[in-house]
């Protein structure tokens, strides 16, 4: 990282940012081009957990190539200045990479989907079986994390 004074290396701080963020942007490989989608996510230990419909471009790409990159940010604010070129941003961001795995086990899918319920404040309780069956759950095994902050 060019600006070492802005680098976040503390693992606990990186995961605090991940827990605070509500949306991640997941980048995948589509032939010779990147493909990026915004998603809600949950955390299971060190892993990101994503959910989706069982079909679509994202699912096709993940099945072809499970290598992914993701980004989250929190505390983003434009810092206005007297002149346009002096504007800045306040932020904390995490960029990570890893491998996507499809969760096929029904009980594990239900457990991971329950993490979304608790993360986003939906009423607790058993998930409808039809939702567990029709929802695709993807675990991203995080291999690398980097972080950056700007005051």
Language-model region placement:
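Charged, gly/pro-rich active-site loop segments
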Residues: 2-5, 75-151
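Structural motif corresponding to alpha-helix initiation and N-cap regions
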Residues: 11, 55-56
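Helix-adjacent hinge/juxtasegments
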Residues: 51, 57-79, 85
């Amino acid at each position: 990282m060019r600006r070492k004074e802005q680098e976040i290396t503390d693992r606990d701080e990186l995961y605090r940012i991940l827990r605070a963020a509500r949306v991640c942007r997941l980048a995948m490989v589509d032939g010779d081009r990147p493909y990026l989608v915004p998603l809600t996510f949950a955390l299971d230990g060190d892993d990101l957990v994503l959910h989706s419909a069982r079909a679509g471009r994202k699912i096709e790409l993940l099945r072809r190539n499970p290598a992914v990159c993701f980004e989250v940010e929190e505390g983003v604010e434009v810092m206005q200045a007297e002149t346009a070129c002096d504007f800045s941003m306040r932020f904390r961001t995490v960029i990570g990479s890893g491998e996507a795995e499809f969760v096929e086990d029904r009980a594990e899918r239900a457990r991971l989907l329950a993490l979304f319920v608790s993360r986003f404040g939906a009423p607790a309780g058993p998930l409808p079986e039809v939702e567990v069956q029709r929802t695709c759950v993807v675990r991203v095994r995080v291999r690398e994390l980097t972080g950056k902050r700007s005051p």
